[in-house]
UniProtKB/Swiss-Prot annotation:
This is Ribonuclease HII. GO terms for biological process: DNA replication, removal of RNA primer; mismatch repair. InterPro entries: RNase_HII (IPR022898), RNase_HII/HIII (IPR001352), RNase_HII/HIII_dom (IPR024567), RNaseH-like_sf (IPR012337), RNaseH_sf (IPR036397). It is found in: Cytoplasm. Manganese or magnesium. Binds 1 divalent metal ion per monomer in the absence of substrate. May bind a second metal ion after substrate binding. GO terms for molecular function: manganese ion binding; RNA binding; RNA-DNA hybrid ribonuclease activity. HAMAP family: RNase_HII_B. Keywords: Cytoplasm, Endonuclease, Hydrolase, Manganese, Metal-binding, Nuclease. The keyword Cell membrane does not apply. It comes from Cupriavidus necator (strain ATCC 17699 / DSM 428 / KCTC 22496 / NCIMB 10442 / H16 / Stanier 337) (Ralstonia eutropha). The gene is rnhB. Its EC number is 3.1.26.4. PROSITE patterns: RNASE_H_2 (PS51975).
Length: 238
């Protein structure tokens, strides 16, 4: 059963309104805390009860194809949504936890800036970003709360798309398969080529690679230089 984790640190207003009074429940989740490369993404979603979406679940248990299908449905049917991120530089400066909080804060603020203001924000996990709305953390919320499930899907798909773009620029690293996580393939590429500017220098395997080899910055001659797909956060029209 979903519950508020009252003992966890709360960074926002944690006085949740009565459930019956909530008209616009905003689900928030992040994607990409663990990888060695790429931004950390977050999404905020307010679902439309008049336009239900079947199949919403924690993005981690869905196939890539199913996530893509649901991504399009969420963007089309949700009352409002916003995707944001924190950069690799922000991750290295703030640490991954605080960068994740920043990405989630940006997602909620972006949604509210569109004119779709939440009555209550529910965040997956045991910590909340600082936002000017009632907010609560829901442990395993991505599996328990449909709006959080939707947010997890948007964040995951958006981040995976950016890592596939990064693969076009640095195919040696295999970003299209591991999307930045520390797989044996990725660690082997770090050992052979060193780290790129898109790697998180504050993460131990990247620090170790930089201690052995200079930064790998050259673009592959055969790859087209493509701008990242998520340089600007996006919000649904009302």
């Amino acid at each position: 059963m979903a519950r508020r984790n009252a003992a966890s640190p709360q960074m926002g207003l944690d006085l949740a309104p009565a459930a019956a009074a909530v008209q616009r429940l905003c689900g928030v989740d992040e994607a990409g805390r663990g990888p060695l490369a790429g931004p950390v993404y977050a999404a905020a979603v307010i679902l439309d009860p008049k336009r239900p979406i079947r199949g919403l679940a924690d993005s981690k248990i869905l196939t890539a194809a199913k996530r893509e299908q649901l991504y399009e449905k969420i963007c089309e049917r949700a009352l409002g949504w916003h995707i944001a991120f924190a950069t690799v530089e922000e991750i290295d400066t703030l640490n991954i936890l605080h960068a994740s909080m920043l990405a989630m804060q940006r997602a909620v603020q972006g949604l509210a800036a569109s004119g779709i203001v939440p009555d209550l924000v529910q965040v997956d996990g045991n910590r909340c970003p600082r936002v000017p709305f009632p907010v609560e953390a829901i442990v395993q919320g991505d599996a328990l709360v449909k709006a959080i499930s939707a947010a997890s899907i948007l964040a995951k798909v958006a981040r995976d798309r950016e890592l596939r773009v990064l693969h076009e620029r640095y195919p040696q690293y295999g970003f299209d398969s591991h999307v930045g996580y520390g797989t044996p393939q990725h660690l082997a590429a770090l050992a052979e080529f060193g780290a790129t500017p898109h790697h998180r220098r504050s993460f131990a395997p990247v620090r170790e690679a930089l201690a052995r080899l200079p930064m790998f910055t050259a673009m592959p001659a055969t790859a087209e230089v493509i701008e990242p797909v998520a340089t600007v956060s996006v919000t649904a029209a009302q």
